C-alpha cells in the first residue's frame, strides 16, 4: 500500500468511526505552532475544514483581528482587551444601564452601543433592528464561546465584519439563493414563486442574523467558521439546503405565510446533516480553497 493510499484508507476509517477530523486537527496544530501565525493559511484551513472546538475561539480571534499574528503578544493584548471590557462594563453599571441581573447578551449589546456611540438615552427605549441582530448573534455566541471577554470581542468583531466587509454582499444573497435553488431544484423555486413566497422568505434571519436563532449552535458554529474566514456565501447554501431537506413539507404548503412560518422554526434534529450538505454544495458550486503556497 502506497503512502497516499494508506492516508486515504486512514481518513475513510477515521470518518467511519467518528474521527473524521484527526488528520485535519494535526494540520491545524502545526499551523498554530508557528511564531507568527499565517492568517491566510488559517483562513484556507477554516474554509476547507470545521475547526476543532478547542481551537475555535483562538482561530476566530486571530482571523477577526482581536489577536495579532505574533504569539508572544497574545497574553499582553488579551490583558488590554480584558481591561477595556471591564472599563466599559463599569461605566454602564455607574450610569445604571446594566446590573448584575442583566442577561449577558444584553450586556454585550449595551457595551457595543456605548463603544460605537449609539447608546440610547434610556435602557427602556425600544431596540433598533440592528440591535436585534446583534442580540441574536450574541445569544448564539454565548453558547459557543465560554469566556465572557472572548465572547464580547468575537461578537463585536463578527458583527463589524457583517457591517463592513460583507456590507455590499449581504443584500445580494437573496438573489443568489434563488439562482442556486433553481440549479438544484427548479420545481421548488417555481412553487415558492407561485405561492408568492419567494420575496417573503426569512432572509433577515438567514442572511442578517446568519441563522442565529434558527440553527442550534453546535451546527451553526461550522457555518460561522466559513463566515469568519471570509465567505458569507456559505449562508446561501445553508438556506438552499434547508429548502431541499424540507422539500416535501414546503411543497405541501400553499401560502407564503405558512411557508415562511415553517422556515423560521425548522425542526432542529436535521441541522447537522443540513450544514454538512450545505458545505458540500458550497464547495461544489464555489470550489475548494487551496493554499497559495
UniProtKB/Swiss-Prot annotation:
<dbReference type="GO" id="GO:1902018">
    <property type="term" value="P:negative regulation of cilium assembly"/>
</dbReference>
<keyword id="KW-0458">Lysosome</keyword>
<dbReference type="GO" id="GO:0032007">
    <property type="term" value="P:negative regulation of TOR signaling"/>
</dbReference>
<dbReference type="InterPro" id="IPR043039">
    <property type="entry name" value="TBC1D7_dom2"/>
</dbReference>
<dbReference type="InterPro" id="IPR000195">
    <property type="entry name" value="Rab-GAP-TBC_dom"/>
</dbReference>
<keyword id="KW-0343">GTPase activation</keyword>
<dbReference type="InterPro" id="IPR035969">
    <property type="entry name" value="Rab-GAP_TBC_sf"/>
</dbReference>
<dbReference type="GO" id="GO:0005765">
    <property type="term" value="C:lysosomal membrane"/>
</dbReference>
<dbReference type="GO" id="GO:0031398">
    <property type="term" value="P:positive regulation of protein ubiquitination"/>
</dbReference>
<protein>
    <recommendedName>
        <fullName>TBC1 domain family member 7</fullName>
    </recommendedName>
</protein>
<dbReference type="GO" id="GO:0062078">
    <property type="term" value="F:TSC1-TSC2 complex binding"/>
</dbReference>
<dbReference type="GO" id="GO:0033596">
    <property type="term" value="C:TSC1-TSC2 complex"/>
</dbReference>
<dbReference type="GO" id="GO:0090630">
    <property type="term" value="P:activation of GTPase activity"/>
</dbReference>
<dbReference type="GO" id="GO:0031267">
    <property type="term" value="F:small GTPase binding"/>
</dbReference>
<feature type="domain" description="Rab-GAP TBC">
    <location>
        <begin position="50"/>
        <end position="231"/>
    </location>
</feature>
<dbReference type="GO" id="GO:1904262">
    <property type="term" value="P:negative regulation of TORC1 signaling"/>
</dbReference>
<comment type="function">
    <text>Non-catalytic component of the TSC-TBC complex, a multiprotein complex that acts as a negative regulator of the canonical mTORC1 complex, an evolutionarily conserved central nutrient sensor that stimulates anabolic reactions and macromolecule biosynthesis to promote cellular biomass generation and growth. The TSC-TBC complex acts as a GTPase-activating protein (GAP) for the small GTPase RHEB, a direct activator of the protein kinase activity of mTORC1.</text>
</comment>
<dbReference type="GO" id="GO:0031410">
    <property type="term" value="C:cytoplasmic vesicle"/>
</dbReference>
<keyword id="KW-0963">Cytoplasm</keyword>
<dbReference type="GO" id="GO:0043547">
    <property type="term" value="P:positive regulation of GTPase activity"/>
</dbReference>
<dbReference type="GO" id="GO:0005096">
    <property type="term" value="F:GTPase activator activity"/>
</dbReference>
<comment type="subunit">
    <text>Component of the TSC-TBC complex (also named Rhebulator complex), composed of 2 molecules of TSC1, 2 molecules of TSC2 and 1 molecule of TBC1D7. Interacts with TSC1 (via C-terminal half of the coiled-coil domain).</text>
</comment>
<dbReference type="GO" id="GO:0009267">
    <property type="term" value="P:cellular response to starvation"/>
</dbReference>
<dbReference type="GO" id="GO:0036064">
    <property type="term" value="C:ciliary basal body"/>
</dbReference>
<dbReference type="InterPro" id="IPR039842">
    <property type="entry name" value="TBC1D7"/>
</dbReference>
<keyword id="KW-0968">Cytoplasmic vesicle</keyword>
<keyword id="KW-0472">Membrane</keyword>
<dbReference type="Pfam" id="PF00566">
    <property type="entry name" value="RabGAP-TBC"/>
</dbReference>
<dbReference type="GO" id="GO:0005829">
    <property type="term" value="C:cytosol"/>
</dbReference>
<dbReference type="GO" id="GO:0070848">
    <property type="term" value="P:response to growth factor"/>
</dbReference>
